[in-house]
Amino acid sequence: MGSGAIPIVLVFLLVFLTWQTIYSSNRDLVRAKEWGDLARRALPFGALALMALSLFVVQGYREGWVLITWMFVSGALIVLASVLSISSTERRANRAFRSGNFQKAAELYRELAEEKPLARHHAYLGAALGASERYEESVDASTEAIKKDPKYGLAYYNRALVLRRMGKKSRAVKDLKQALEADLPRRFRSAARKILEELA
């Protein structure tokens, strides 16, 4: 393999890994056939792919301003794509949740669930309600997420955490096992296993 092929291989490897990350984080959208939302989530991938492909054109120019302009435009495109990949309501809800304002997060997630009743929106609503100690509402929201997508593991996981807080150990164990069998992100899998060990 020549030295010119190495950047090509690295670019395609980067594009492939980026797509895998986007796909694995959004399998629920694929199951729900929400192609528009999936495409929106893939905008940063598209921007990165465009940047990677345009690199081959830019390499031929010797003027420094071309490379600097390319870097600036590519960076701006990636930032813009990242901003557009998630709705402003979801971004505000996520920010409220991360900052501990669970009441505001619940309001915004409820708005999202009413606007577009995806399993993820109901699961996020359930998480915010659970963090607000509104346990019955949280269980209802997570149950609605499971009805919408029985393979959405995060809904089982969130419901299990709330059931555990409510003292319903056997139901929590059942949901944690379901979460591990379903489509649960890797970082939650280890937490689910640890909680199962504690409850056993």
Predicted regions located by residue number:
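Short coil turns that delineate tetratricopeptide repeat
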Residues: 116-117, 150, 184
